[in-house]
């Protein structure tokens, strides 16, 4: 490191001797202007050819993000509208299903009532027919028994008394 410092010091002394012997650090020398000119050229090149494409890409990205955000808002609105439409349609369908179910219950009750009335009528008719048959059979049995009572009573009296009782002769 000592060699490097001595080399720098030697070059500074040579530069001072060439410049006339006096160097003031407040007064700029020619290298400052050369460095300033190179810096301004590099700055101009960067400003002209590097910054515009980067700015363009950033602007495109920002526009794409804004479009995506707008699309997201629009999609959210469409989803909300579709959800509201779905809920409305579902409520209407439930109401319609309820009314159909109520109508079916009423129709079912009417059918049951009609069938019950028909069955009750058939039962009443069957009971009436059976009652009439039983009445006829009872009347027939009664008249048959009444016609045979005289003969049976005479036979029974003959057996009990041991005498032949003829009901025709006593009349």
UniProtKB/Swiss-Prot annotation:
It holds the Pfam family ATP-synt_B. It is a single-pass membrane protein. The chain crosses the membrane at residues 32-52. One of its GO terms (cellular component) is proton-transporting ATP synthase complex. The keyword Transport applies. It is found in: Cell membrane. The keyword Transferase does not apply. Keywords: ATP synthesis, Cell membrane, CF(0), Hydrogen ion transport, Ion transport, Membrane, Transmembrane, Transmembrane helix, Transport. GO terms for molecular function: proton-transporting ATP synthase activity, rotational mechanism; proton-transporting ATPase activity, rotational mechanism. SUPFAM superfamilies: F1F0 ATP synthase subunit B, membrane domain. F-type ATPases have 2 components, F(1) - the catalytic core - and F(0) - the membrane proton channel. F(1) has five subunits: alpha(3), beta(3), gamma(1), delta(1), epsilon(1). F(0) has three main subunits: a(1), b(2) and c(10-14). The alpha and beta chains form an alternating ring which encloses part of the gamma chain. F(1) is attached to F(0) by a central stalk formed by the gamma and epsilon chains, while a peripheral stalk is formed by the delta and b chains. Belongs to the ATPase B chain family. F(1)F(0) ATP synthase produces ATP from ADP in the presence of a proton or sodium gradient. F-type ATPases consist of two structural domains, F(1) containing the extramembraneous catalytic core and F(0) containing the membrane proton channel, linked together by a central stalk and a peripheral stalk. During catalysis, ATP synthesis in the catalytic domain of F(1) is coupled via a rotary mechanism of the central stalk subunits to proton translocation. This is ATP synthase subunit b. It comes from Mycolicibacterium gilvum (strain PYR-GCK). The gene is atpF.
């Amino acid at each position: 490191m000592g060699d490097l410092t001595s080399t720098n010091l030697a070059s500074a002394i040579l530069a001072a001797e060439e410049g006339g012997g006096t160097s003031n650090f407040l007064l700029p020398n020619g290298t400052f202007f050369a460095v300033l000119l190179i810096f301004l050229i590099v700055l101009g090149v960067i400003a002209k050819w590097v910054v515009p494409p980067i700015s363009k890409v950033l602007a495109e990205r920002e526009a794409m993000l804004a479009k995506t955000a707008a699309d997201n808002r629009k999609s959210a609105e469409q989803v909300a509208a579709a959800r509201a439409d779905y809920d409305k349609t579902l409520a209407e369908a439930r109401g319609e299903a309820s009314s159909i179910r109520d109508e079916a219950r009423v129709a079912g009750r009417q059918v049951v009532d009609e069938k019950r009335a028909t069955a009750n009528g058939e039962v009443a008719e069957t009971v009436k027919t059976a009652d009439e048959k039983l009445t006829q059979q009872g009347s027939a049995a009664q008249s048959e028994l009444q016609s045979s009572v005289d003969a049976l009573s005479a036979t029974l009296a003959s057996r009990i008394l041991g005498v032949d009782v003829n009901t025709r002769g006593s009349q």
